[in-house]
């Protein structure tokens, strides 16, 4: 049986129904068309292909509309006998929704989940079967599959806004400005940005005032939030949650200190020597002069890396791409599929290059300068970061152990160590 979606209309329906402005209701019911008119209504201006009409017949088809809720079938779907399945559950597709051919059920489920920002939990092993008969049994795995097959969150968020109209405040820089007027964001970068759990306001005004000397308690709290936020961000970006848990742990255990430096630069974390030494407890325990000097050298290296990033005026989209490039490294030990991880790093790098060339056409060397900052992040010793920011919080517990606990617990902000207060 031929599949006809609501965005295509047989001209003879208009003639038979005496309704040149719309389809014949009886004929539409006989076809069993897709979603309701409110969901499937098309708007002019997107320029997507449509089924041509026979010359001289009334009832020209509606032009495709926003990227969100198209309901658009494949070309010629009204005349072919092709049956297109929902890429999520295998049921009969009603058209193209949020970038993929899906049924009405999966389309509505995805839209509801994204618009309401719903969070689901899998009671099994996060690998439940999703088909016509089991799609309602696990919402977590159903949403996971929607994202895996390529349904786009950003298409839902745009709703029916015209393509040229920006969504005010949708993506904000650390200074609170919307991406300096940049209207271009690839779908991948959009998802990276939406995974960011730490807007500047979360850390208060102190974090944004480099000349303000923070107290030890504030330093401990801010550092903990930056670390926890890095893990939370990784858990919500594309592709990372689909990796084996052992691979997730390996990647974060290797790269956590680099992500921490990037987050510190992004929020303009004050790095004054005196409170950092106090936070590290150097005044409480005897230390040789040589060791103190060496420790201060490490602090200087940390400060330099942060300042060099700040000097480039890196925006939020660039920070997200840089963190993804750092995270998806095949250098981690014991990866089950290093080639796949490397391909994700290449995808992140290509997304950054495309974004930079589109948004900064007058800075041809900007992409190279950003990439050149990444190798030097490893010059900041992870053990020094632990001593500076976390020894008062968790004692001798290795950061790698904490990261593993955060991943396994499923929530960084409800992590048990957060109950420990800096003293």
Swiss-Prot record:
Compartments (UniProt record): Nucleus
GO biological process: cell differentiation; negative regulation of neuron projection development; negative regulation of transcription by RNA polymerase II; nervous system development; positive regulation of transcription by RNA polymerase II; signal transduction
Protein name stated in the entry: COUP transcription factor 1
DNA-binding region (UniProt annotation): 83-158
Domain NR LBD as annotated: residue spans: 184-410
Reported impact of residue 115 to P: In BBSOAS; decreases transcriptional activity
InterPro entries found in the cross-reference section: NHR-like_dom_sf (IPR035500), Nucl_hrmn_rcpt_lig-bd (IPR000536), Nuclear_hormone_rcpt_NR2 (IPR050274), Nuclear_hrmn_rcpt (IPR001723), Znf_hrmn_rcpt (IPR001628), Znf_NHR/GATA (IPR013088)
Organism classification: Eukaryota, Metazoa, Chordata, Craniata, Vertebrata
Organism: Homo sapiens
